[in-house]
From Swiss-Prot:
Belongs to the universal ribosomal protein uL3 family. PANTHER family: 50S RIBOSOMAL PROTEIN L3, LARGE RIBOSOMAL SUBUNIT PROTEIN UL3M. Keywords: Mitochondrion, Ribonucleoprotein, Ribosomal protein. It comes from Neurospora crassa (strain ATCC 24698 / 74-OR23-1A / CBS 708.71 / DSM 1257 / FGSC 987). Residues 80-101, 237-262 are annotated as: Disordered. The gene is mrpl9. It is found in: Mitochondrion. InterPro entries: Ribosomal_uL3, Ribosomal_uL3_bac/org-type, Transl_B-barrel_sf. Transmembrane segments: none annotated. GO terms for cellular component: mitochondrial large ribosomal subunit. Component of the mitochondrial ribosome (mitoribosome), a dedicated translation machinery responsible for the synthesis of mitochondrial genome-encoded proteins, including at least some of the essential transmembrane subunits of the mitochondrial respiratory chain. The mitoribosomes are attached to the mitochondrial inner membrane and translation products are cotranslationally integrated into the membrane. GO terms for molecular function: structural constituent of ribosome. Component of the mitochondrial large ribosomal subunit (mt-LSU). Mature N.crassa 74S mitochondrial ribosomes consist of a small (37S) and a large (54S) subunit. The 37S small subunit contains a 16S ribosomal RNA (16S mt-rRNA) and 32 different proteins. The 54S large subunit contains a 23S rRNA (23S mt-rRNA) and 42 different proteins. GO terms for biological process: translation. This is Large ribosomal subunit protein uL3m.
């Protein structure tokens, strides 16, 4: 409800009430005031006859503040706090996605196994050091959407695991998707919903092309506890001239007065070295082979032999050509035309098996011909 104004405020008003019951218009009232023939009077007991001519005729129901002319604010959602009549917020999930829009790849990446390093001979005879990465049964396991998860991402799995080594909840997770249990799972954020892929499709090395630059992320080899010379490249102390048992020490760690008689945060000191995530950016792709399932990149990659690394389009370079992106999507649709149908069938079978397990009928179903495969997928096999 609109707030009440005291009577002293009404006396200072110089407007003439305009309503259907009065025949005096504003123009006529103004002429009378100029001629000095009349003086407008207002009744302190009827303020409602003044306000219709001063404020717009809008409803105040649902408006929190008295004389606001803004419409009712929309209720903020979990991932979007933008309201009507207000500028876009500079903080929150929506603003964070907007800031990272230009640095988020358009496509998902893949998981690969580092097989080792070798030499690639260029056309001019130059010996180029390179790393061989193998894609071992890389499949799309799930998609994350903006409405449900707050961002767009693709979950990718590498390799396979025996069902005996996987927990029951994870077995049900894979069973509902019709995918065997994966050795490693990883998530790759994409810019929008165009980067999502059908669940169950397999990504081959031709997901990339020769000459493309990629970013490779991996876990560096653990070096254990290392000193300052190995960990940070310190020069060490004097080799002679009175130095005793301090040849590889780091020396002073700070002053006694200017720094407050303390060791400043971030001081480089001996400690555990390695076993941290490291990204090598802008590595050119030298070779792609679908038969061998390998991608050869120039240079070194973090991790030991057999380590799992993430390979994705470079964020600091131009994305792949639009024609190539569309061609790869079309190729996936041709290779897996019934991916959606298989997913729905797997979900239906998962619900049936889940209900059978809940009722304790899974043993009888197995005797009647239903078997659960070792890879975690459930299937109905016709008994001989």
């Amino acid at each position: 409800m609109a707030p009440r104004l005291p009577a002293r405020c009404w006396r200072q008003l110089s407007l003439v009430e305009r309503s259907a019951t009065h025949t005096t218009t504003t123009a006529a009232a103004s002429s009378l005031l100029l001629a000095g023939r009349t003086t407008p009077t207002f009744s302190a007991s009827s303020p409602s006859t003044v306000f219709p001519s001063l404020l717009p005729q809008i409803t105040k129901r649902g408006v929190k503040y008295g004389w606001s002319t803004l419409p009712k604010r929309s209720r903020p959602t979990r991932f979007n706090q933008v309201t009507q009549g207000l500028p876009a917020p500079t903080s929150g999930p929506a603003a964070a996605l907007k800031r990272r829009e230009k640095t988020t790849p358009l496509r998902t990446g893949v998981l690969a196994v580092k097989k080792g390093m070798t030499v690639f001979m260029g056309r001019t005879g130059a010996r180029i050091p390179c790393t061989v990465l193998q894609l071992d049964r890389v499949q799309v396991v799930a998609n994350k959407t903006r409405a449900k998860n707050g961002y767009w991402a693709v979950q990718v799995g590498l390799g396979e695991r025996r069902a005996e080594n996987v927990g029951a909840p994870q077995l049900g997770y894979y069973e509902a998707k019709g995918i065997p249990p994966k050795q490693t799972l990883a998530e790759f954020k994409v810019r929008n919903q165009d980067g999502l892929l059908p669940v169950g499709v397999q990504l081959f090395p031709d997901w990339f092309h020769v000459g493309q630059v990629v970013d490779v992320r991996g876990i560096t080899r653990g070096m254990g506890f290392a000193g300052g010379m190995k960990r940070h490249g310190f020069a060490g102390q004097e080799a002679s001239h009175g130095n005793s048992l301090n040849h590889r020490t780091i020396g002073s760690v700070g002053g006694s007065q200017g720094s407050g008689s303390r060791v400043l945060p971030g001081k480089k000191m001996p400690g555990r070295m390695g076993a941290q995530q490291h990204t090598v950016q802008n590595l050119p792709i030298l070779m792609v082979d679908n038969e061998l399932g390998i991608v050869v990149v120039k240079g070194a990659v973090a991790g030991h032999k057999g380590a799992v690394v993430k390979v994705q389009d470079a964020v600091k370079k131009a994305p792949p050509p639009e024609e190539f992106v569309e061609a790869t999507k079309q190729l996936l649709n041709e290779r897996f035309p019934d991916a959606e149908e298989k997913l729905q069938a797997a979900r239906k079978l998962h619900l049936e098996l889940k209900e059978a397990r809940r009722q304790g009928l899974i043993d009888s179903l197995i005797k009647n011909g239903l078997t659960e495969k070792a890879d975690g997928n459930a299937a109905v096999e016709a008994s001989a």
